[in-house]
């Protein structure tokens, strides 16, 4: 189904904040999330003619593009780290990890210690309030698997918050 540039601009404007928030939670870094948000929308614009609203909402589709963009970024970072380690270069990570305005230090610390998969499902279901079907589509899993993953991620988050406070 063909969609116009106007439709893309409308969807981009409507869902920009959600995509950015998803990427902040996924990466744990506002600066990286901003770069990936720009890359996500550049990729989405190139692929917009393939978007079919009968297969899901624009928000879900854009989050799928964002997830793919983030995975590409993580793979590139891993390749970079391997190259640096191979040549014994020690390059410090100089970015600030910030998950969101108003989070307690305990919760922010707990989220930073969680896996990207756990942060992603929490961001999609809790922060962006996507249903299990939409979040599952973004993550490439069934709605049931998405609900299970969320439940387990929230249990791990609760343990992390408890261990962070006790430490």
Task: Give, region by region, the residue ranges found by the protein language model.
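C-terminal edge and immediately downstream basic/flexible tail or linker adjoining helix-turn-helix-like DNA-binding
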Residues: 2-8, 101, 137-140, 154-167
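Internal acidic/polar
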Residues: 80-104, 131
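Arg/Lys-rich amphipathic alpha helix in sigma70-family domain 2
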Residues: 46, 50, 64-86, 100
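Structural recognition of an alpha-helix C-terminal capping motif at a helix-to-coil junction
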Residues: 35-42, 46, 56-68
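C-terminal flanking helix
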Residues: 16, 20, 41, 115, ...
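Helix-turn-helix DNA-binding module
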Residues: 112, 116-120, 128-148, 155-159
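Amphipathic, Lys/Arg- and hydrophobic-enriched alpha-helical face
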Residues: 12-30, 46-47, 63, 111, ...
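A short, charge-rich alpha-helical start-of-domain segment used by transcription regulators
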Residues: 1-21, 34, 45, 119
């Amino acid at each position: 189904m063909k969609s116009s540039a106007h439709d893309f601009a409308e969807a981009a404007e409507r869902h920009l904040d959600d995509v950015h928030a998803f990427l902040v939670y996924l990466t744990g870094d506002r600066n990286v999330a901003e770069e990936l948000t720009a890359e996500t929308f550049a990729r989405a614009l190139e692929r917009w003619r393939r978007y079919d609203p009968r297969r899901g909402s624009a928000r879900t589709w854009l989050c799928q593009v964002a997830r793919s963009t983030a995975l590409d970024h993580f793979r590139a970072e891993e390749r970079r780290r391997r190259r640096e380690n191979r040549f014994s270069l020690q390059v410090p990570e100089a970015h600030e990890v910030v998950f969101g305005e108003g989070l307690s230090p305990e919760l922010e610390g707990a989220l930073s210690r969680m896996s990207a998969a756990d942060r992603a499902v929490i961001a999609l279901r809790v922060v962006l309030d996507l249903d299990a079907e939409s979040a599952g589509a973004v993550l490439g899993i069934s709605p049931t698997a998405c609900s299970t993953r969320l439940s387990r991620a929230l249990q791990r988050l609760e343990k992390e918050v408890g261990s962070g406070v006790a430490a």
